[in-house]
């Protein structure tokens, strides 16, 4: 079965994550999308009340089950800074994929 790994990460971590993916044998490819959002947090300034959205990147990888743990670990180890807001990773089942 195939899985979709979706990660929301800080923009400056993407290059390190891509480099880590290059070390995974048979890595299937990825999509990187500019996005904005916010998680559970307290507002820290007047600016936050005007525009709570922070820029981030969404990384999507469709992969076989056997590769998912490697992909998730590569993201976790290269996106982690230890600060709140480092991101989140979702792993979901892919019901069907159709090449165009």
Functional labels for PLM-detected ranges:
Residues 1-100:
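Positively charged, small/polar-rich N-terminal and surface patches that mediate targeting and assembly
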């Amino acid at each position: 079965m195939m899985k979709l790994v979706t990660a929301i990460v800080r923009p400056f971590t993407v290059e390190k994550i891509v480099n880590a993916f290059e070390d995974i044998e048979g890595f299937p490819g990825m999509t990187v999308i500019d996005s904005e959002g916010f998680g559970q947090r307290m507002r820290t300034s007047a600016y936050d009340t005007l525009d709570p959205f922070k820029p981030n990147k969404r990384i999507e990888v469709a992969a076989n089950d056997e590769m998912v743990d490697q992909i998730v670990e590569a993201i976790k180890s290269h996106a982690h800074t230890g600060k709140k807001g480092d991101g989140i990773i979702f792993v979901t089942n892919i019901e069907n994929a159709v090449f165009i």
